[in-house]
Amino acid sequence: MPKSKELVSSSSSGSDSDSEVEKKLKRKKQVVPEKPVKKQKPGESSRALASSKQSSSSRDDNMFQIGKMRYVSVRDFKGKILIDIREYWMDSEGEMKPGRKGISLNMEQWSQLKEQISDIDDAVRKL
């Protein structure tokens, strides 16, 4: 028989057990597992900071804005060149983060898209 989280109010004798069940449900909802904090060694923090600055500047060089918060970027991922067309959003610290909406094209797909641009333009003009 499936367990239900609904509380059925009955006579006053059952109200004590109902309140106990309610308290247990509230406790379960409040418990949120915390993510473990990663500790960095003193030498690592400076290296990580330097690499993040370097990657962000190179990322900015390869980003081309095509809309309000939409960019085309060229990047290297596991030795393969990818062209990303993606929406970005601003986090609470004012840093741009990539959004869910987007696509990554490998070089073959990018070449096929470039070859079909004139056909796509013609289709847009017809509409």
From Swiss-Prot:
GO molecular function terms attached to this record: DNA helicase activity; DNA-binding transcription factor binding; double-stranded DNA binding; identical protein binding; RNA polymerase II cis-regulatory region sequence-specific DNA binding; single-stranded DNA binding; transcription coactivator activity
Region feature (Interaction with ssDNA): 77-101
Modifications the protein undergoes after translation, according to the UniProt entry: Activity is controlled by protein kinases that target the regulatory region. Phosphorylation inactivates both ds DNA-binding and cofactor function, but does not affect binding to ssDNA.
Biological processes annotated in GO: negative regulation of DNA metabolic process; positive regulation of transcription initiation by RNA polymerase II; protein homooligomerization; regulation of transcription by RNA polymerase II; RNA polymerase II promoter clearance
Gene Ontology annotations for the cellular component aspect, listed alphabetically: nucleus; transcription regulator complex
Xref: InterPro entries: PC4_C, ssDNA-bd_transcriptional_reg, Sub1/Tcp4-like
Biased composition (Low complexity): 7-16, 45-57
Cross-link (Glycyl lysine isopeptide (Lys-Gly) (interchain with G-Cter in SUMO1)): K68
Region (Disordered): 1-62
Swiss-Prot/TrEMBL site (Cleavage) positions: A50, S51
Ranges annotated as biased composition (Basic and acidic residues): 31-44
Residues annotated with Phosphoserine modification: S4, S9, S10, S11, S13, S15, S17, S19, S55, S56, S57, S58, S118
Region (Regulatory) residue spans: 1-50
Location (main, coarse): nucleus
Chain positions with N6-acetyllysine modification: K35, K53, K68
Gene3D superfamilies reported for this sequence: Transcriptional Coactivator Pc4, Chain A
Compartment(s) where it occurs, according to its Swiss-Prot or TrEMBL record: Nucleus
Domain of life from the UniProt record: Eukaryota
Biological role stated in the UniProt entry: General coactivator that functions cooperatively with TAFs and mediates functional interactions between upstream activators and the general transcriptional machinery. May be involved in stabilizing the multiprotein transcription complex. Binds single-stranded DNA. Also binds, in vitro, non-specifically to double-stranded DNA (ds DNA).
Membership in a protein family: Belongs to the transcriptional coactivator PC4 family.
Quaternary state and interactors: Homodimer. Interacts with CSTF2.
Name the UniProt record assigns to this protein: Activated RNA polymerase II transcriptional coactivator p15
Species this protein is from: Rattus norvegicus (Rat)
